[in-house]
Amino acid sequence: MKLRRLSLGFYLCVFSLLVVACHVEFSPNAQWRDIPSVYCVLDPEEDTVWVRVQRCYLGDDTLYNYSTIADSTNYPEGSIRVKLLAWEGQRGTHNSLTATNRLVDSWDLVYLELPGKPDGDFASGSQPIYYCVPGHRLLEDTACVFELLVINQRNDTLARATTSLVGFQTLTRVGGDTVESVLVEPNTARGHAFGYRVPNKGEIKWNTLPRGRRYQPTLIFHYAKHGDTMSIPVKGSYLVNTNNDLTLSSKSITQERLLSYVKESLKDNRDTIYIVNMVGIVIDACNEDLHAYLNSQNSASGASQDYQIYSNIEGGVGIFGSRRTHILANVPCDSSGKEGYLASELKKLHVGFSGDWGK
């Protein structure tokens, strides 16, 4: 009996320690409120708009009672509505747009649950998302101001945001196609090729876009292996357009940078490979809202604790911005075999290049 009493006393002692260690002060009637967390990035060359809406907690009391609610981060289906509206924009200085009171179009977004990942890394449950399919009408409405609304069952607006699309350069008709001229150099019309005739310098020059604030060029390097064309994307550093009157922007993707990407990607290759005499140049662009959000995210990932996350969501948090990711040009690659130029330098990497050019 002494042993039993000793054991019981031991368990009571441990239990009391756990109670003290896990003690949480909270009031079941504490004031707390749902704050919508909204993420949407428009791309005028995409036919579908996707919006992620979750909810987060803001209040002065404990999160304990909030965390016990099942699926507390998602709004149940039917509890909110998400709308996208396009308002006619009035042009201002530097291609800025201000919304007028003329509604061009509107869309009620559809609720959809994306399947979750049941196990392994990044396991999660199903993810609710909202979408609409304006089609290529977005392409025609780059002079509009877009408004995003999150509305509850009582028809109250929980969150609201506006943004404008990154615009287009002058569109021209060539045959039956609409052509936009963004890339300036290399100029394929003048027979220019992308390469490193000036050692270590591969310049990309482009026309700035209306409401384009942040740009990132990417070089798509191609090579041939067993008759198939493979690609290695080589990202350049991004450029922020701080001068609204600037009409041209440029950035270099150096030979050194290209070689380092290729060497890392092909370090385990044991086959003979060939250079393809064509490269792709992709230019991504985003507007001021998305640039400010990305910039604040970069600050948050650093060592400093003195930062604020940018949000343009009224009544909530998150981002409603725009980007363009389909600006692509294919240009010839400089096929000079001289010492110090691309072909000879690729061969020196010892990752399988024959030194010959594929087609």
Model-derived regions: residue spans:
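Bacterial N-terminal signal peptides that target proteins for export
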Residues: 2-11
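A sequence/structural signal for flexible, mid-protein segments enriched
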Residues: 22-359
